[in-house]
């Protein structure tokens, strides 16, 4: 192969956003931590963003979004079927993606929408933006994630228009999800759809978080019941079967919910940061912490 041909190929790859040449310091401590987590929780992939003590929460979130965007860009291939959940973390991640890849991938919602229809984090906005950035296709969901009754939810799920979406759920290659934290975090764009009775029931059953708008306890057990039956979204057992299920989340307050997801292997790829992983290991009383040098926190 001629040198000029290689040069042209590299230039084209850079232009399409496939290749980015950067010189970065290799963090051996983070690498070792990733290997430990990957082995402990049987993960296909993990990306741990280093933390600097002076970083604000906003800066930490931005670093996470950039790392997640870079990972997703690498993983989406020609004709991939990609399921997308929604929320602030995923919205920020999608905003960070810069891609000129032409993939013809299909991007589909895996949960109903929030109550605030104009939200920039609405799942329909996210699948549209992903399809635009990867020169792919998308379909929308035209129902809020929580319905008033199980009968209403069943009617929507059984409808002709919803069949196409459910068919794609059965063929997902990749799922990209956020992970919600404790019940006390109520400023979410969909938790206002929950009733007082929903909150009371979830508190009694010790919910620690949610994913795809499905609540679970500290062991990762899905909390089934009236709320579950009113929820439009992929259930976590289904998420577990997706070849690449990517969870994107950070913060100590979410560590219990992330740990629960890992215990049940609902996700096989985690993108998070250093302080979150260390908090997870503290919750697990993992001896690995005894050997870890807290250089940057």
List the model feature ranges, each with a label.
Residues 17-32:
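Short Lys/Arg-enriched helix C-cap and helix-to-coil transition segments
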Residues 7-10:
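Key DNA-contacting residues within the recognition helix of helix-turn-helix
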Residues 82-92, 181-183, 251-253:
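Gly/Ser/Thr-rich loops at beta-strand to alpha-helix junctions
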Residues 31-32, 218, 222-297:
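ATP/nucleoside-binding phosphotransfer catalytic cores, i.e., glycine-rich phosphate-binding loops
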Residues 1-2:
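Short coil turns linking two alpha-helices in DNA-binding domains
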């Amino acid at each position: 192969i001629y040198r000029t041909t290689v040069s042209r190929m590299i230039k084209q790859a850079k232009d399409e956003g496939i290749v980015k040449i950067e010189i970065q310091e290799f963090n051996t401590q983070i690498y070792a931590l990733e290997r430990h987590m990957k082995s402990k929780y049987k993960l296909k992939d993990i990306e741990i963003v280093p933390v600097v003590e002076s970083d604000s929460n906003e800066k930490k979130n931005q670093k996470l979004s950039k790392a997640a965007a870079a990972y997703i860009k690498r993983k989406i291939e020609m004709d991939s079927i990609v399921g997308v959940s929604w929320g602030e973390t995923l919205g920020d991640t999608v905003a960070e993606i810069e891609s000129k890849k032409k993939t013809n991938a299909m991007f589909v919602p895996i949960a109903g929408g929030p109550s605030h229809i104009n939200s920039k984090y609405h799942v329909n906005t996210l699948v549209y933006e992903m399809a635009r950035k990867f020169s792919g296709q998308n379909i929308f969901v035209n129902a809020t994630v929580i319905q008033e009754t199980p009968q209403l939810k069943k009617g929507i799920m059984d409808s002709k228009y919803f069949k196409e979406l459910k068919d794609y759920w059965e063929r997902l290659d990749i799922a990209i999800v956020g992970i919600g934290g404790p019940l006390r975090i109520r400023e979410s764009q969909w938790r206002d759809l929950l009733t007082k009775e929903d909150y009371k029931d979830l508190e009694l059953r010790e919910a620690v978080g949610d994913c795809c708008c499905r609540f679970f306890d500290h062991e990762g057990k899905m909390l089934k019941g009236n709320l579950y039956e009113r929820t439009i979204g992929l259930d976590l057992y289904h998420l577990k079967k997706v070849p690449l299920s990517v969870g994107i989340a950070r913060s100590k307050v979410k560590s219990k919910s992330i740990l629960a997801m890992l215990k049940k292997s609902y996700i096989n790829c985690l993108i998070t940061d250093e302080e979150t992983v260390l908090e997870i290991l503290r919750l697990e009383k993992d001896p690995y912490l005894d050997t870890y040098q807290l250089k940057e926190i």
